[in-house]
Amino acid sequence: FGSSRRSATKVFGPPLPSARAVQLRTPRAAMNRLQRIAGHVVATGADAPLRMAPTSSAMSAAEKSDDDVVICCAVRTAIAKANRGAFKDTPCEELLAPLFKAVKERTKLDPAAVGDIQIGNVSQPGAGAVTSRMAQFMGDLPFEIPLSTVNRQCSSGLQAVANIASSIRSGVIDVGIAGGVESMSMYNMASSVDPSKFSTKIADSDLAMACLIPMGITSENVAEAYKIPAEKQNSMAVASHNKAIAAQKQGLFDEEIVAVKASVK
């Protein structure tokens, strides 16, 4: 959701037409969920600092209910490199609009049933509300559907998903669309921060000043704090890329990726 050069959307809704997500989980169900989440994390050793258990093993025994909030459709664009990749000259609205169209076509959903749309983003001007709203219309979704955007840095798309799911569970809406979009070619992190516009009083707070630390330095600090050397980071990166290549060859991404025509200048 909302990676540097891609866009992704998810559609949520009740599994049954008449179901509404208004019933809160029982203490037992909540405890089961905590146990599943805890079981998803595997104790790490010196040779595997970030080893995780398969998601399937954590959710296979999940209790099902008619008021469960479920993902009905999940799509995304392909991933490209910032500043020199296939999407470097493609605006965010042109990345997001095809996904709205794909969601509408694949689900055969009546747009009137959609109660809300929320899109996560970080660097777009105007909190990304304008570009996401334009993408909504370019994606053939009517103006009657409200849209909002959210910025929680790298978790922006995930926060949008959580917010829409929460709205369904609380009974505010029955169906919603959530996702994220970002282009670090069009809007890089530095361009969205102008230190001259901040109060001079931020210098009085170490934490306030720390908000200006770039993510690159933050990652170095985290690696040092948790004693994760570059060799282990590189090893994990290689393993991740190998898994991605294997998944591509097996066609595991074919269904979720929506083709987007792009012009490179």
Language-model regions, residue ranges each:
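Compositionally biased, low-complexity segments
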Residues: 3, 14, 52-56
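Claisen-condensing/thiolase-fold acyl-transfer catalytic domains that form or cleave C-C bonds
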Residues: 123-130, 134-137, 141-143, 150-172
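N-terminal, intrinsically disordered, basic low-complexity segments enriched in Arg/Pro/Ser/Thr
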Residues: 12-17, 24-25
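Short, high-confidence coil segments that cap the C-terminus of an alpha-helix
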Residues: 172-174, 253
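Conserved "HGTGT" condensation-loop signature of ketosynthase/thiolase-family condensing enzymes
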Residues: 27, 32-145, 181-265
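Low-complexity, disordered terminal segments
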Residues: 1-5, 9
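Intrinsically disordered, low-complexity proline-rich regions
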Residues: 20-21, 29
